[in-house]
């Protein structure tokens, strides 16, 4: 599959985005297709990765941003959660729509998250956790 380079608009999610972000995250981490890409956790963890109510709770936390990457048409293609705690910022829920994986969007999201955390939260250190069953990460 060819990789298409696209310019993205990065913005914090709003309540109206929660359903679309839930669909994105679940498609990236818990796809129905057994032949899914490397990000799939289907064989490791049962059930959906998130839901709109959980995402709304993230949005309502102080010093928290669910950063979205939107294409020119406005469709959400990726996300990453940033949450500040004192001088640290925690990065999580990095997800890219399966059709865009391998395009460099994940890297762009991490770069944008780093800039956001420094600019908006004054973070001095960024921390990223991965699921312990993924020893290759």
Regions found by a protein language model. Give the residues of each.
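Conserved beta-strand in the GNAT
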Residues: 68, 75-83, 90-95
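Conserved acetyl-CoA-binding loop-helix of GNAT-fold acetyltransferases
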Residues: 96, 102-115
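Conserved GNAT-fold acetyl-CoA-binding loop/helix
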Residues: 26-55
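A short helix-loop-beta-strand connector motif used in the catalytic cores of GNAT acetyltransferases and
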Residues: 48-68
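Conserved beta-strand-loop-alpha-helix junction that forms the acyl-donor binding cleft
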Residues: 101, 127-137
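Conserved N-terminal entry element of GNAT/NAT acetyltransferase domains
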Residues: 1-19, 23
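Conserved GNAT acetyl-CoA-binding A-motif
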Residues: 110, 117-130
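Hydrophobic adenine-recognition pocket in adenosine-nucleotide-binding enzymes
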Residues: 13, 94-96, 130
